[in-house]
Amino acid sequence: MTSFALNPRLEGDSVFVTDLPLSSVRLMKDANYPWLLLVPRKSDLVEIIDLDDNDQVQLMREISLASTALRNATECEKLNVGALGNQVSQLHVHVIARFRDDSAWPGPVWGVVPPKDYEPDHADRLIGDLRDALADVQ
């Protein structure tokens, strides 16, 4: 197995938030929807079933923790969670905060409107809140 490397598209479309025991947590560069990616730091993964049993359990725990942190930070009305991988095959899980008044509601977020940059102070505050919420995860 080769060493872990983050897919260049995932790296370019997101910013680092923190590392959990298994996954790197990243914030998508799209203020239309507060949106996290969890990327397990293991090489050659495409599907959740490519993880061993213990790592599958850990990933689910991290999805739950990231979902809770995002919901608390944004006070969203709904969370969308999924591992699609149609554009980027490297295993990554989307955790998206949704609001009834967002531009894509109630449909999926992909391709509805162009990505919108965060105001720097808003992104910094959100990342700080998420880091604080995820700081003590083992």
Feature annotation, model-predicted:
Residues M1-Q138:
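HIT superfamily nucleotide-processing domains
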